[in-house]
Swiss-Prot record:
Protein name in the entry: Suppressor of tumorigenicity 7 protein
Topology versus the membrane: Multi-pass membrane protein
Residues spanning the membrane: 15-35, 62-82, 512-532
Organism ancestry: Eukaryota, Metazoa, Chordata, Craniata, Vertebrata
Gene: ST7
GO CC terms in record: membrane
Length: 585
């Protein structure tokens, strides 16, 4: 019974929907019938005569003014359409038609039709969109005092945006603070320092934290004269204060390295003490987690200082030791620093070993992973690659593997080749990047362009093959080939991360819709005709009459038919006559 009742209700509902669909036709015929019945009381014939008389009395100037007014309104609509498209990336009229008018006219709403299918895939797609649009810490970020500030002193431009620096401040508060910092005066000061917006205020707070720690140790040491050395070890200096000074106050890499070495001494002592107390409660566990982050950060920056100062082998050893000591801390992406250092040493076998570990389907990809894999495969064939020879004999297996690796890398981040091929100018990389975005492309090319130039023929192979990727994925926002569809949010996030003087690379490149171009041409042509008709009415009348005579002439019709149907002389039964004198004029 329940199934029968449900079926009856569904049938009744479908009948009602069907009746509402065709109700407008019934309404239309009813209106026509009422107009016919009331034609005498409403004096429809007299009104039609009056309207026709009014239209006959109108002069051509009225039509010219009407055309000009309509062209002006169309131009305003066009300007609004262009502004809306530049800001939101879509046509306003198209969006209104699809979103609002299509459901009213009986169109199918994609959201409602796919409601049943979206329940299974919503979670996966949402997770993917969140991961694709997540902002990551740049593993190869520069030093503010020794590199970013020097760029500002020379050029007068700010290489970092407020949004980027705000994200760095949030990272510092996450990595270098914990809930028990208020128990130690120096850590309490540094907790406030990481939230300061003014760089000088942060540097002053770091010096204050070091001075407080020094004064406290001097006061407590004389209390127990027999254990002076023990008291000095009990009160280590603040490691996070040294980190801030090394990052922002040091004007050279050598000065930053000295400060990081002092921070390492203080941070190592705090780490060993908190390691022994981490199981005594949640407070000690949080403190040990903070000390671990501080120690890993210091060692990583020391390795980067060694890399900047030319001690590449020492930097590689420090990075390997750090990855062995803390294998679970993947948030710093130390393997990307290691890959760049190994490429500098031209240790391609070691690079391949690192890629074999991290270029896994279960691990998140990056431009460094994909393009380094492409570089290694291109290195095997790039010195002998020739586009002409490849077009004649076809691609070999090794060349095909290299081309596929380049296509894979370009699909992941299509902005990188423009910087590697020097089609766009490089800027200093930001402190945060967006995977598959322009910011990640800048960060990768800034450090890896020299490695591509060092491999003979690699850039030539990239130049010949990278654009072929776009033929494999004609609709990258809807469907990808080896990766998920390209995220839409990259342009907005990159504009927040990159400085205003840099032209953000957009993919896929937005083109003006045909509707806007057609409207612009039609409005411009109509406005020009209206202006010419108003200024030169007699001349435009002669021109219009001549055009009508040309298009209505027999010669033009014969010539048009001959050009379309490709008639031959035998079918005409006479030789083709030359064009008439009237048509030649």
């Amino acid at each position: 019974m329940a199934e029968a009742a449900t079926g009856f209700l569904e049938q009744l509902k479908s009948c009602i929907v069907w009746s509402w669909t065709y109700l407008w036709t019934v309404w239309f015929f009813i209106v026509l019938f009422l107009v016919y019945i009331l034609r005498v009381p409403l004096k429809i014939n007299d009104n039609l005569s009056t309207v026709s008389m009014f239209l006959n009395t109108l002069t051509p100037k009225f039509y010219v003014a009407l055309t000009g007014t309509s062209s002006l309104i169309s131009g305003l609509i066009l300007i609004f359409e262009w502004w809306y498209f530049r800001k939101y990336g879509t046509s306003f009229i198209e969006q209104v038609s699809v979103s609002h008018l299509r459901p009213l006219l009986g169109g199918v709403d994609n959201n409602s039709s796919n409601n049943s299918n979206s329940s299974n895939g919503d979670s996966d797609s949402n997770r993917q969109s969140v991961s694709e649009c997540k902002v990551w810490r740049n593993p190869l970020n520069l030093f503010r005092g020794a590199e970013y500030n020097r760029y500002t002193w020379v050029t007068g431009r700010e290489p970092l945006t407020y949004y980027d620096m705000n994200l760095s401040a949030q990272d510092h508060q996450t990595f270098f603070t914990c809930d028990s910092d208020h128990l130690r005066p120096a850590d309490a000061i540094m907790q406030k320092a990481w939230r300061e917006r003014n760089p000088q205020a942060r540097i002053s707070a770091a010096h204050e934290a070091l001075e407080i720690n020094e004064i406290r140790s001097r006061v407590e040491v004389p209390l127990i004269a027999s254990s002076t050395i023990w008291e000095i070890k009990l009160l280590p200096k603040c490691a996070t204060a040294y980190i801030l000074l090394a990052e922002e106050e040091a004007t050279t890499i050598a000065e930053a390295e000295k400060l990081f070495k002092q921070a390492l001494k203080a941070g190592d002592g705090c780490y060993r003490r908190s390691q022994q107390l981490q199981h005594h409660g949640s407070q000690y566990e949080a403190q040990h987690r903070r000390d671990t982050n501080v120690l890993v950060y210091i060692k990583r920056r020391l390795a980067m200082c060694a890399r900047r100062l030319g001690r590449t082998r020492e930097a590689v050893k420090m990075m390997r030791d750090l990855m062995k000591e803390f294998p679970l801390l993947s948030m710093f992406n130390i393997h990307e620093n290691l890959l760049e250092a190994l490429l500098e040493l031209q240790a391609y076998a070691d690079v391949q070993a690192v890629l074999a570990k991290y270029d896994d389907i279960s691990l998140p990809k990056s431009a460094t992973i994909c393009y380094t894999a492409a570089l290694l495969k291109a290195r095997a064939v790039s010195d002998k690659f020739s586009p002409e020879a490849a077009s004649r004999r076809g691609l070999s297996t090794a060349e095909m593997n290299a081309v596929e690796a380049i296509h894979r890398a370009v699909e992941f981040n299509p902005h990188v080749p423009k910087y590697l091929l020097e089609m766009k100018s490089l800027i200093l990389p930001p402190e945060h990047i967006l995977k598959r975005g322009d910011s990640e492309a800048i960060a990768y090319a800034f450090f890896h362009l020299a490695h591509w130039k060092r491999v003979e023929g690699a850039l030539n192979l990239l130049h010949c093959t990278w654009e072929g990727t776009f033929r494999m994925i004609p609709y990258p926002l809807e469907k990808g080939h080896l990766f998920y569809p390209y995220p839409i949010c990259t342009e907005t996030a990159d504009r927040e991360l990159l400085p205003s003087f840099h032209e953000v690379s957009v993919y896929p490149k937005k083109e003006l819709p045909f509707f806007i171009l057609f409207t612009a041409g039609l409005c411009s042509f109509t406005a020009m005709l209206a202006l010419l008709t108003h200024q030169f009415p007699e001349l435009m009348g002669v021109f219009a009459k001549a055009m009508i005579d040309i298009f209505c002439s027999a010669e033009f019709r014969d010539w048009n038919c001959e050009s379309i149907f490709m008639r031959v002389e035998d079918d005409l039964e006479m030789p083709p006559a030359p064009q008439s004198q009237h048509f030649q004029k």
